Amino acid sequence: MTIMRKNHPLLKLVNNSFIDLPTPSSISSWWNFGSLLGVCLIMQILTGLFLAMHYTSDTATAFSSVTHICRDVNYGWLIRYLHANGASMFFICMFIHVGRGIYYGSYMLSETWNIGIILLLTTMATAFVGYVLPWGQMSFWGATVITNLLSAIPYIGTTLVEWIWGGFSVDKATLTRFFAFHFILPFIITAFVLVHLLFLHETGSNNPSGLNSDSDKIPFHPYYTIKDLLGVLLLLMVLMILVLFFPDVLGDPDNYTPANPLNTPAHIKPEWYFLFAYAILRSIPNKLGGVLALILSILVLALFPLINSSKQHGLVYRPITQIIYWIFIANLIILTWVGGQPVEYPFTMIGQIASIMYFSIIIIFMPMASMIENDILKLHY
């Protein structure tokens, strides 16, 4: 069997990726989230497939079909809530994964990092079109508001929006195409994940110390397969507590009301994992400016490899940048909270300050801290 897994064309790929992969011996539990994201993706594809068997992408029956899944299909309620809350777990793992990449300087593996940004954007697109499918009030109005932002693009904006809608408003054509997008995008994500892993295995994993670990590596199996299994069990435990005890805690009550184009909800807001970007969008009074800020809030991550001027890898031995990093995390939490609040004083002001802070920390304060730390190092050596 040993010879077969090392020589067989297909098994050799699996062997080099998950069994005999040389891995740094010092990587901590923060490195577990890559495998957890893989588990989340597989789970979302499987639960989504079973939901798609019973769902109808028609404005007249979409809401009823979701109700039918929950009431009449065997364990349909479980599949539906696993899928909905699985998306939340997916984003929690993804945000931690990106946060770990920033903290430990993993962005210096620039190809892997850039594919990761594409993955984040694709996942956000998938989650957005998926949220429209139950055809509740928040589904309909969320789709209307967010797609309408494209009309801010000069000259072609209005035409583009009508092209995406398939008409002059969000209607049957929109729902059908969003279902098609929601079905195909996870497979595109899977392809990008393979490219992400391909680039990662070209360079090897980073590690908490930020030093070269070529001299101290261990095989991935059994050491990290067991460690990842513990992470998977903890993830599933949290997910099952969420699904079985608090299935609607992360959802919006408005989505239990069928979509009605004549009645606007009091507060239109997306799912919690988009609230930070939504807060940045809302904090700019100009429509086009808001859209650009929304896109840049994710694309700004691509600047990390370019503006990094530190002599050290990661933030482990950089106390000034560490403080700035944790202010950045706190700022993100504030943005998420503000995104869910109504558009009125003081929330608008807090949102604007937090949005300025978000970009300033990445573009100004972190590079400045790196330069100060480099100077301190020069004084010592």
UniProtKB/Swiss-Prot annotation:
<dbReference type="InterPro" id="IPR048260">
    <property type="entry name" value="Cytochrome_b_C_euk/bac"/>
</dbReference>
<keyword id="KW-0813">Transport</keyword>
<feature type="transmembrane region" description="Helical">
    <location>
        <begin position="113"/>
        <end position="133"/>
    </location>
</feature>
<feature type="binding site" description="axial binding residue">
    <location>
        <position position="97"/>
    </location>
    <ligand>
        <name>heme b b566</name>
    </ligand>
</feature>
<keyword id="KW-0349">Heme</keyword>
<dbReference type="GO" id="GO:0005743">
    <property type="term" value="C:mitochondrial inner membrane"/>
</dbReference>
<protein>
    <recommendedName>
        <fullName>Cytochrome b</fullName>
    </recommendedName>
</protein>
<keyword id="KW-0679">Respiratory chain</keyword>
<dbReference type="InterPro" id="IPR036150">
    <property type="entry name" value="Cyt_b/b6_C_sf"/>
</dbReference>
<keyword id="KW-1133">Transmembrane helix</keyword>
<keyword id="KW-0472">Membrane</keyword>
<dbReference type="InterPro" id="IPR005797">
    <property type="entry name" value="Cyt_b/b6_N"/>
</dbReference>
<keyword id="KW-0496">Mitochondrion</keyword>
<dbReference type="GO" id="GO:0046872">
    <property type="term" value="F:metal ion binding"/>
</dbReference>
<dbReference type="Pfam" id="PF00032">
    <property type="entry name" value="Cytochrom_B_C"/>
</dbReference>
<keyword id="KW-0999">Mitochondrion inner membrane</keyword>
<dbReference type="GO" id="GO:0006122">
    <property type="term" value="P:mitochondrial electron transport, ubiquinol to cytochrome c"/>
</dbReference>
<feature type="transmembrane region" description="Helical">
    <location>
        <begin position="347"/>
        <end position="367"/>
    </location>
</feature>
<feature type="transmembrane region" description="Helical">
    <location>
        <begin position="288"/>
        <end position="308"/>
    </location>
</feature>
<dbReference type="InterPro" id="IPR005798">
    <property type="entry name" value="Cyt_b/b6_C"/>
</dbReference>
<dbReference type="Pfam" id="PF00033">
    <property type="entry name" value="Cytochrome_B"/>
</dbReference>
<feature type="binding site" description="axial binding residue">
    <location>
        <position position="83"/>
    </location>
    <ligand>
        <name>heme b b562</name>
    </ligand>
</feature>
<keyword id="KW-0812">Transmembrane</keyword>
<comment type="subunit">
    <text>The cytochrome bc1 complex contains 11 subunits: 3 respiratory subunits (MT-CYB, CYC1 and UQCRFS1), 2 core proteins (UQCRC1 and UQCRC2) and 6 low-molecular weight proteins (UQCRH/QCR6, UQCRB/QCR7, UQCRQ/QCR8, UQCR10/QCR9, UQCR11/QCR10 and a cleavage product of UQCRFS1). This cytochrome bc1 complex then forms a dimer.</text>
</comment>
<keyword id="KW-0408">Iron</keyword>
<keyword id="KW-0479">Metal-binding</keyword>
<dbReference type="GO" id="GO:0008121">
    <property type="term" value="F:ubiquinol-cytochrome-c reductase activity"/>
</dbReference>
<keyword id="KW-0830">Ubiquinone</keyword>
<dbReference type="InterPro" id="IPR048259">
    <property type="entry name" value="Cytochrome_b_N_euk/bac"/>
</dbReference>
<feature type="transmembrane region" description="Helical">
    <location>
        <begin position="320"/>
        <end position="340"/>
    </location>
</feature>
<comment type="function">
    <text>Component of the ubiquinol-cytochrome c reductase complex (complex III or cytochrome b-c1 complex) that is part of the mitochondrial respiratory chain. The b-c1 complex mediates electron transfer from ubiquinol to cytochrome c. Contributes to the generation of a proton gradient across the mitochondrial membrane that is then used for ATP synthesis.</text>
</comment>
<feature type="transmembrane region" description="Helical">
    <location>
        <begin position="226"/>
        <end position="246"/>
    </location>
</feature>
<feature type="transmembrane region" description="Helical">
    <location>
        <begin position="33"/>
        <end position="53"/>
    </location>
</feature>
<feature type="binding site">
    <location>
        <position position="201"/>
    </location>
    <ligand>
        <name>a ubiquinone</name>
    </ligand>
</feature>
<feature type="binding site" description="axial binding residue">
    <location>
        <position position="196"/>
    </location>
    <ligand>
        <name>heme b b566</name>
    </ligand>
</feature>
<dbReference type="InterPro" id="IPR016174">
    <property type="entry name" value="Di-haem_cyt_TM"/>
</dbReference>
<dbReference type="GO" id="GO:0045275">
    <property type="term" value="C:respiratory chain complex III"/>
</dbReference>
<dbReference type="InterPro" id="IPR027387">
    <property type="entry name" value="Cytb/b6-like_sf"/>
</dbReference>
<feature type="binding site" description="axial binding residue">
    <location>
        <position position="182"/>
    </location>
    <ligand>
        <name>heme b b562</name>
    </ligand>
</feature>
<feature type="transmembrane region" description="Helical">
    <location>
        <begin position="77"/>
        <end position="98"/>
    </location>
</feature>
<keyword id="KW-0249">Electron transport</keyword>
<comment type="similarity">
    <text>Belongs to the cytochrome b family.</text>
</comment>
